[in-house]
Design a protein with these regions (language model features):
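Conserved nucleotide-binding/hydrolysis micro-motifs of P-loop NTPases
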Residues: 39-41, 64-66, 132-135, 155, ...
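Walker A/P-loop NTP-binding active-site region of P-loop NTPases
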Residues: 5-64, 113, 126-148
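Structural motif
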Residues: 344-346, 378-380
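C-terminal lobe/tail of nucleotide-utilizing enzymes
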Residues: 164, 192-338, 347-351, 355-371, ...
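Short C-terminal beta-strand
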Residues: 383-385
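Phosphate/Mg2+-binding loops and adjacent switch elements
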Residues: 82-222
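Extreme N-terminal starter segment of soluble prokaryotic enzymes
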Residues: 1-3
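P-loop NTPase motor core
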Residues: 39-41, 45-94, 101-104
């Protein structure tokens, strides 16, 4: 399934871009599902896929309902513990949605579309309206992060020892985690794995919406770094609300000139690898299918499905006795600056922080037998140098 995720700085028109992309895909003959958290004028707002045209369905995420359903289910599964401590139950009507629940609801919706009940509906294209730019990139990194937390907190080897739990509980003097907790963790891990596979698929791309101007230029520069760190792929940058050039009105002419200068920078920085599409200002917010068609947003291109390659690579220098003299782990980070870069080696992992973005990367087996000897950020590429540890690296006789 071809998947397009739309985002951009707040107020830049990412929801409009999602709707225009979905309509273009449907018009191109693709059976399309459009997912949004915000209402879209002229489209039905049901929480189950509802037909818009013959080839286009739309569904709106209800994060409040998802939060209430999840918490109610958790209460039922933990009823034994709650009864033990004399805790009362919370009714669905009294539950108030907590911060962060919208992100979890979106991940749940992505799972339904990728591997859940909606995945059997025969959709060719999935278009998802994501939150604003920085929040969206953090959201797409969340499945990998949450799965790591689950592995650390509830490792599989402990679940395998469930027959020893009563004995261990007596020895430790504290109750061991109940079976339902491991089962719940396994279900969530499977759900997160499906979403992570969708994000990492080479047929999944991002489309960025931004209104030309200094603020958007800085936001996109930061976003390029986040895209590279997380290994995400963008297929289009839409410059939204582009004013007509050569206006006789001095005020409009000045605004258009500022936009044109910014557009020149975007074409130089993003194209041709990522095309820049200029969507005209309609003089009003797009509200109809004709308005969306007037933006002339292209339909998604065809891409082969399968896990995309990791964004990093390893370079090596030959040494003696079959042991390399040095290995260099390389990761492109366009737009990154040294002052905002933090790198920590911890065991088999690299902890990378670049500006507002953070990622923990498990290094290749060869690098686990090495020590870090240095790092440098040059020409937009982070290079981490590893020196083989003689005590761990096998020697050739």
């Amino acid at each position: 399934m071809r998947t397009v995720l739309t985002t951009g700085p707040g107020g830049a028109g990412r929801t409009t871009l999602a709707a225009a992309t979905a309509l273009a895909a449907a018009a191109d003959g693709s059976r399309t599902l459009l997912v949004s958290a915000e209402p879209i004028p002229g489209l039905p707002g049901g929480t189950e896929p509802t037909a818009v045209t013959d080839r286009l369905d739309h569904v709106r995420i209800d994060s409040g309902a998802h939060f209430r359903a999840e918490l109610t289910d958790l209460q039922e599964r933990a009823s034994g513990v709650l009864d033990l401590v004399g805790a009362g139950r919370l009714d669905g009507e009294e539950l108030t949605e907590l911060p962060g629940s919208a992100q979890l609801a979106l991940l749940h919706t992505l799972h339904r579309a990728a591997a859940g009940d909606w995945s059997t509906a025969g959709y060719d294209t999935l278009v998802v309206d994501l939150p604003p730019l920085t929040e969206a990139l953090a959201l797409l990194a969340l499945p990998e992060q949450l799965r790591r937390y689950l592995r650390r907190l509830l490792p599989a080897e402990r679940q395998a020892a469930r027959a020893l739990r009563p004995v261990l509980a007596q020895l430790a003097g504290v109750p061991m985690p109940a079976q339902w907790l491991y089962e719940a963790a396994a279900r969530k891990d499977a759900e997160l794995a499906a979403v992570q596979a969708l994000v990492e698929d080479s047929a999944t791309t991002l489309r960025l919406a931004a209104e030309p101007g200094p603020a958007a230029e800085e936001a996109l520069r930061t976003a390029r770094t986040g895209l590279a760190l997380y290994g995400l792929r963008a297929d289009l940058l839409v410059a939204n609300r582009v004013l007509p050039r050569h206006s006789p009105d001095p005020w409009f002419a000045a605004l258009a000139a500022e936009q044109e200068k910014c557009l020149g920078h975007w074409h130089a920085e993003w194209a041709p690898e990522i095309p820049v599409h200029e969507a005209p200002h309609l003089g009003r917010d797009p509200r109809t299918a004709d308005d969306l068609a007037a933006l002339a947003v292209p339909a998604p291109d065809e891409r082969e499905a399968g896990r995309a390659e990791d964004p990093w690579w390893i370079e090596g220098e030959p040494g003696e006795s079959g042991t390399p003299a040095e290995l260099t782990w390389c990761l492109p980070l366009p737009g990154a600056v040294k002052e905002e870069l933090r790198l920590v080696r911890r065991g088999d992992e690299l902890l990378l922080t670049v500006g507002p973005f953070h990622r923990i990367i498990r290094v290749a087996s060869a690098l686990r037998r090495c020590t870090v000897s240095g790092a440098a950020l040059t020409d937009g590429v982070l290079r981490v140098r590893f020196t083989p540890d003689p005590g761990l690296w096998p020697r050739t006789p």
